[in-house]
Amino acid sequence: MEKSWFNFMFSKGELEYRGELSKAMDSFAPGEKTTISQDRFIYDMDKNFYGWGGRSSYSNNVDLLVSSKDIRNFISDNTFFVRDSNKNSYSIYFDIKKKIFEIDNDFSDLEKFFYSYCSSSYLNNRSKGDNDLHYDSYIKNTKYNCTNHINSCIDSYFRSYICIDSNFLSDSNNYNESYIYNFICSESGKIRESKNYKIRTNRNRSNLISSKDFDITQNYNQLWIQCDNCYGLMYKKVKINVCEQCGHYLKMSSSERIELSIDPGTWNPMDEDMVSADPIKFHSKEEPYKNRIDSAQKTTGLTDAVQTGTGQLNGIPVALGVMDFRFMGGSMGSVVGEKITRLVEYATNQCLPLILVCSSGGARMQEGSLSLMQMAKISSVLCDYQSSKKLFYISILTSPTTGGVTASFGMLGDIIIAEPYAYIAFAGKRVIEQTLKKAVPEGSQAAESLLRKGLLDAIVPRNLLKSVLSELFQLHAFFPLNKN
């Protein structure tokens, strides 16, 4: 464990280096040379240190003396020895990898080095000068400022290292409300001496989470969703699940897609009570098939990997089937095949346009050849729907659409539409490379590549999908029931 200095020196003299602390820390990239002295640099915090949100300064009139090494390496796994203006000394220990943060009074060897440093020529040469009263009051107020500086450096490091959202940790003018500060200081603002304060991060390293106050996923998951690409937050009321910051398309549940496409109050589900009965008594060492079905049902609230029913799209009656990837990867078993078959037959009898939204990993292996037969069964009723009745079927491919679904009804639409950046394939990249011993070009299985090769008719963004479908139906003589 490396031991380093984290000392605060107080003076009224001329400063050698000025600027915002955040800029100073950003300038010390790993392996980067600086023009500042390799031993130490003095930093002016007077009216120059601002909050993450650009608010008023947290502390004033404190000069920070630290090593000029990279601030991230400086904090990542070190022990710091700190002394305040009241001669109180303590050590701070960080270990990012083990997620440990400790404050301790046991400084032993560090204390000797500290006092030898305090007697150095730098401190002895600092004179009070003429403004002694100002200097004394300046020193008396440094305990609070010193604490805030420690907190500021800690927060700044964690913000850059763990990508903390500034609006999450700093949402007021009072720095004392920050999460890190609450770990260091008690309500009275005094330094705590207890040990083993722990800081934990979530899987995406997007923010710091306190079990009581900052558990966003538990308290606010009904309001916000997090982008799995840039980790930005999106308001759930915007129902298209497209990141406003990076444009990434997030997965949508079948219920969300129905709500996005179907007019409110017009959805009539079909065959909701149909469940799988484990037809081949599939044996698994890890988890029985029935247990997996039960677990998926509890997680998703669905009976199987597809929802079917009828409703109105901008006033136009339609038959709609939406697959849900959350339910065992959207795999197609006997229940999925039967529900889609019944939906197509109903649409044929009622002369309704048909929409099938695909999101699947393919046939369900736990049902063996029965799952493969669903490909032929659905294709058969679609042939009657399209060829005999001359009705209109639109296939919508979302990410991912693979395997037996791609090889059957996914590619049988009169119009085949895909979402932007959707992954569409029969066999996955890994399977192809292991079978053919050839590398699969990057992006060759993306919707944009398939559109260029003529396998798709269009790529339609989610926010335009409903209006595009409405126009396509009207072009094929399917009109709203009530015209205003």
Curated annotation (Swiss-Prot):
Its EC number is 2.1.3.15. Residues 223-484 form the CoA carboxyltransferase N-terminal domain. It is an enzyme of class 2 (transferase). One of its GO terms (cellular component) is chloroplast stroma. Its cofactor is Zn(2+). It holds the Pfam family Carboxyl_trans. Its main location: plastid. A zinc finger (C4-type) spans 227-246. It is found in: Plastid, Chloroplast stroma. Binds 1 zinc ion per subunit. It catalyses: N(6)-carboxybiotinyl-L-lysyl-[protein] + acetyl-CoA = N(6)-biotinyl-L-lysyl-[protein] + malonyl-CoA. Zn(2+) binds at residues 227, 230, 243, 246. SUPFAM superfamilies: ClpP/crotonase. Pathway: Lipid metabolism; malonyl-CoA biosynthesis; malonyl-CoA from acetyl-CoA: step 1/1. InterPro entries: AcCoA_carboxyl_beta, Acetyl_CoA_COase_Trfase_b_su, ClpP/crotonase-like_dom_sf, COA_CT_N. Keywords: ATP-binding, Chloroplast, Fatty acid biosynthesis, Fatty acid metabolism, Lipid biosynthesis, Lipid metabolism, Metal-binding, Nucleotide-binding, Plastid, Transferase, Zinc, Zinc-finger. GO terms for molecular function: acetyl-CoA carboxylase activity; ATP binding; carboxyl- or carbamoyltransferase activity; zinc ion binding. One of its GO terms (biological process) is fatty acid biosynthetic process. Belongs to the AccD/PCCB family. Component of the acetyl coenzyme A carboxylase (ACC) complex. Biotin carboxylase (BC) catalyzes the carboxylation of biotin on its carrier protein (BCCP) and then the CO(2) group is transferred by the transcarboxylase to acetyl-CoA to form malonyl-CoA. Acetyl-CoA carboxylase is a heterohexamer composed of biotin carboxyl carrier protein, biotin carboxylase and 2 subunits each of ACCase subunit alpha and ACCase plastid-coded subunit beta (accD). NCBIfam families: accD. This is Acetyl-coenzyme A carboxylase carboxyl transferase subunit beta, chloroplastic. It comes from Capsella bursa-pastoris.
